[in-house]
A protein has these predicted regions:
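Glycine-rich phosphate/diphosphate-binding loop of Rossmann-like nucleotide-binding domains
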Residues: 6-38, 44-45
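Short, glycine-/small-residue-rich phosphate/pyrophosphate-handling segment
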Residues: 112-128
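N-terminal small/polar loop signature for handling phosphorylated ligands or for N-terminal nucleophile
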Residues: 29-89
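Single conserved hydrophobic/aromatic residue that forms the stacking wall/gate
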Residues: 127, 132-136
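Basic/polar N-terminal segments that are highly enriched at the extreme N-terminus
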Residues: 1-4
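Glycine/small-residue-rich loop that forms an oxyanion/phosphate-binding "nest" at active or ligand-binding sites
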Residues: 85-108, 113-117
């Protein structure tokens, strides 16, 4: 991380659907506006595909150059949503089922709706802290 008196950040958008144009990025403007409002300078925004090596390599580059890196995309229930496991790999953290997240999701879905794809959303890297707000 470069030494600076100002706090800076990068935004890393992950998803083939963004790159193909099938989905429009709606997160960057909101996130950058909020970060700037609290004094964090957004230095860079990158859009990359759902490829583990690309995610790991890009994340490692950005975290060396910025105080913070915010990722969006790739955390849903589909097979190509590999952001969490890629973040785990970049930081050398274990990737496993988060018991508390699993319980929350299981309680949220109706019986029979908490399928394998949705259960995947409870798998993440160790040291994960769940948000305490009821809006997430």
């Amino acid at each position: 991380m470069k030494k600076s008196t100002k706090v800076n950040a990068a935004i890393l958008i992950i998803g083939n659907e963004i790159l193909s144009g099938r989905t429009q990025d709606t997160n960057t403007s909101t996130l950058a506006t909020w970060l700037n409002s609290i004094g964090v300078i957004v230095k860079e925004v990158r859009v990359i595909p759902d490829i583990e090596k690309t995610i790991v390599d890009t994340l490692n580059i950005l975290r060396k150059e910025n105080n913070y890196v915010f990722t969006t995309g790739g955390i849903g229930p589909t097979h190509d949503d590999i952001t969490a496991q890629s973040v785990s790999k970049a930081f050398g953290l274990k990737y496993e089922t988060h018991k508390e997240a699993f319980k929350i999701l299981e309680a949220y879905y109706k019986p029979g709706e908490f399928n394998e794809g949705r259960q995947k959303m409870a798998v993440s890297y160790t040291h994960l802290t769940l948000p305490t707000t009821p809006y997430v």
